[in-house]
A protein has these predicted regions:
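Central regulatory/effector-binding core of bacterial HTH transcription factors
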Residues: 55-117
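Hydrophobic hinge/microswitch elements
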Residues: 93-97, 102-105, 112, 163-217
């Protein structure tokens, strides 16, 4: 094979001497070795490129609360399938989600308020969850709490959905000043767990704290349910990886309490 290779390139590649135990490259052989190493690298890169071409991309965006409390177990379930899919996850505001979908930077997205008004996009409910009242484990709130009995000075406000804010203004007034304003339930860990502290939280987020750090009650006059919407490009079918992800999401949501699924 070596002689055939030398005949093909038209020059000796090895120095041959009787009794020599080690092979020595000629000057042409040294150059050929360098070329061969480059060819090997190119071949490896070509194989890697072919592998990448076989992997699909699934690009998903969601608002902060959805990405923090709802989707992480679904991401885990989807990745455990070991599909030839690279998953891209983005946390975006509704307005940024709209632009990213229209520019084909996303396959689909989830928003938590129906504020998208564009004929090029389709918005449909994905699931619905009620708001529950969370308080310290040793609090004495009844199983059903009248909002009129709550002290807004003991509240941690974490929800900024327009419908929730209208409910809040109706019960506590537009000038109400809660104890703490935040965008995550984790901020509750900064507060001393005094008996009267409370927060209105979506059911799925509340479930992560039941028993461990909070007691859960219902409202006699609750805020409007929190609805998550699936946003896609109008008239464009979802890819097989996207459909499989939604299937995993549906399975996860059906196992949750207090959640109505529309997928």
């Amino acid at each position: 094979r070596i002689r055939a290779l030398e005949e093909r390139v038209g020059t000796p590649l090895f120095v041959r001497s009787k009794g020599q135990r080690h092979i020595t490259l000629t000057a042409a052989g040294q150059k050929f070795l360098t070329l061969a190493q480059r060819w090997q690298q190119l071949l490896s890169e070509t194989e890697t490129l072919a592998e990448l071409e076989q992997r699909a991309y699934l690009r998903i965006a969601a608002t902060y609360t959805t990405n923090q409390y709802i989707l992480p177990p679904v991401y885990k379930r989807f990745l455990a399938l070991r599909l030839p899919v690279s998953l891209w996850i983005h946390t975006l505001r509704d307005v940024d989600i709209t632009q990213a979908l229209l520019s084909h930077e996303l396959d689909f997205a989830f928003i938590d308020s129906n504020t998208v008004f564009d004929d090029r996009l389709t918005v449909r409910p994905a699931f619905r969850e009620p708001f529950l009242l969370l308080s310290p484990p040793d609090s004495h709130y009844p199983e059903e709490v009248d909002p009129a009995s709550l002290d807004v000075a003991e509240e941690m406000l974490v929800t900024w959905d327009p419908e929730f804010i209208r409910w809040h203004d109706r019960w506590f007034g537009t000038g109400a000043r809660p104890l703490l304003y935040a965008d995550t339930l984790q901020a509750a860990d900064f507060l001393p767990p005094t008996e009267g502290r409370w927060v209105a939280a979506p059911a799925i987020a509340a479930a992560s704290r039941i028993g461990k750090s909070a007691r859960v009650c219902r409202f006699t006059s609750p805020p409007p349910d929190r609805v998550n919407y699936l946003v896609t490009r109008a008239g464009e079918p979802l890819t097989p990886p996207a459909l499989r992800f939604l299937q995993e999401l549906k399975g996860h949501l059906l196992a949750q309490d207090n959640v109505q699924v529309y997928l």
